[in-house]
């Protein structure tokens, strides 16, 4: 029987059908949080179910064609075609059954920090912010700036953004599925605008990414007693006050020392809620990173993407060249990449990760 050969796929189909029934119930329809969680799991199972149904169809058609092959030459020809098609369909199903990163469908919190290089590093951090914003626009995602410290020349000392998809995307289309590869040190080589002798300078910016926790995420629980909350006045570029109320929030998680600053919402209550969500996201990322390290499983590429010290990419302006050091991807369209044409670079990381996961399954 089919489910004896691929029991995991048969189980996925049963769960998929059960979720569809739940999502149609009035109780779930009236509960957005429950509906979102079920929708995410439904999308996660979709690739497996689609591949499984395709495999079942080919198997059934092949059996029927073989049964009639002795009586009709057309059926014999059809049976031969289906025999040739079956291995490819089966391989697609085996690939779909390889566990994905469970966070792929989640949205993403990203921090960009200017590194070595002074004002030039801050200007480059601003370039990265623009690049990711343009890329998100091309993908139909929204970008919300949660906190930002800028320089007098328009550079970015540090910025935190939330990148979010619309609705409930399939895991492969989720924000985290693509943006998790962006964590690390990004190096730039170019002639600074302040360089009078035309010398190329190397500077860097660090990017930190982690999947965004849901507001009601029960995977992470925070005891209010573990929080220290400071309230202060929001500030803009150069320390200028952007409002006259103390609405900015600094939230510190005492057990881990993680600190989150939030000032871009309109009220203290909104900044508290936003800070708590970012804190939960950080703790969720830490939890998953620890689990991956302990289990030494297929999520190693995600852990690598969270490594803040790894130089992952070089942006060479004089040669209009971009290099991803993890995959050896190289192209001479840096201007287009910085304008948001980033997909080919990210695809090289996705393909390398998929190859690793396939190798680890064998």
Swiss-Prot record:
The record describes its post-translational modification as: Methylated by PrmC. Methylation increases the termination efficiency of RF1.
* Leader sequence segment: none
Q: Which SUPFAM superfamilies match?
A: Release factor (SSF75620)
UniProt keywords (A-Z) are:
Cytoplasm, Methylation, Protein biosynthesis
Q: Which Pfam families does the entry link to?
A: PCRF, RF-1
Q: Which InterPro entries match?
A: PCRF, Pep_chain_release_fac_I, Pep_chain_release_fac_I_sf, Prokaryotic/Mito_RF, RF-1
Q: Name one GO molecular function term.
A: translation release factor activity, codon specific
Which GO CC terms are listed, alphabetically? cytoplasm
Residues that the record marks as modified (N5-methylglutamine) are 240
Q: Which residues form a coiled coil?
A: none
Q: Where in the cell is it found?
A: Cytoplasm
Record's keyword annotation contains Transmembrane helix? no
Task: Name the principal localization, coarsely classed.
Answer: cytoplasm
Tell me, what does this protein do in biology?
A: Peptide chain release factor 1 directs the termination of translation in response to the peptide chain termination codons UAG and UAA.
What name appears for this protein in its UniProt entry?
Peptide chain release factor 1
**Species whose genome carries this gene:** Bifidobacterium longum (strain NCC 2705)
Tell me the name of the encoding gene. prfA
């Amino acid at each position: 029987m089919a489910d004896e050969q691929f029991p995991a796929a048969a189980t996925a189909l049963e769960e998929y059908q059960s979720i569809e029934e739940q999502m149609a119930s009035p109780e779930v329809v009236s509960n957005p949080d429950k509906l979102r969680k079920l929708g995410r799991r439904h999308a996660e199972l979709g690739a497996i179910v689609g591949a499984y149904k395709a495999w079942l169809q080919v198997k059934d058609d092949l059996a029927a064609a073989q049964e009639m092959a002795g009586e009709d030459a057309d059926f014999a020809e059809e049976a031969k075609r289906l025999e040739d098609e079956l291995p490819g369909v089966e391989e697609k199903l085996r690939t779909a059954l390889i566990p994905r990163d469970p966070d792929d469908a989640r949205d993403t919190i990203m921090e960009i920090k200017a590194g070595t290089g002074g004002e030039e590093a801050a200007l480059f951090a601003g370039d990265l912010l623009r690049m990711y914003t343009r890329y998100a626009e091309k993908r139909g995602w929204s970008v919300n700036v949660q906190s930002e410290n800028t320089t007098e020349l328009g550079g970015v000392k540090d910025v935190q953004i939330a990148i979010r998809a619309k609705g409930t995307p399939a895991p492969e289309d989720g924000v985290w599925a693509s943006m998790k590869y962006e964590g690390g040190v990004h190096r730039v080589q170019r002639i600074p605008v302040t360089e009078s002798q035309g010398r190329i300078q190397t500077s860097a910016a660090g990017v930190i990414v982690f999947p965004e926790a849901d507001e009601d995420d029960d995977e992470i629980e925070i005891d209010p007693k573990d929080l220290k909350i400071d309230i202060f006045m929001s500030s803009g570029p150069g320390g200028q006050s952007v409002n006259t109320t103390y609405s900015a929030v600094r939230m510190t998680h005492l057990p881990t020392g993680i600190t989150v600053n939030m000032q871009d919402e309109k009220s203290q209550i909104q900044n508290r809620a936003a800070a708590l969500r970012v804190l939960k996201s950080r703790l969720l990322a830490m939890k998953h990173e620890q689990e991956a390290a302990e289990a030494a499983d297929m999520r190693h590429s995600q852990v690598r993407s969270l490594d803040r010290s790894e130089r992952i990419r070089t942006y060479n302006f004089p040669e209009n060249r971009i290099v991803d050091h993890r995959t050896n991807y190289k192209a001479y369209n840096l201007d287009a990449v910085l304008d948001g044409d980033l997909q080919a670079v990210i695809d090289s990381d996705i393909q390398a990760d998929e190859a690793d996961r396939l190798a680890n399954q064998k």
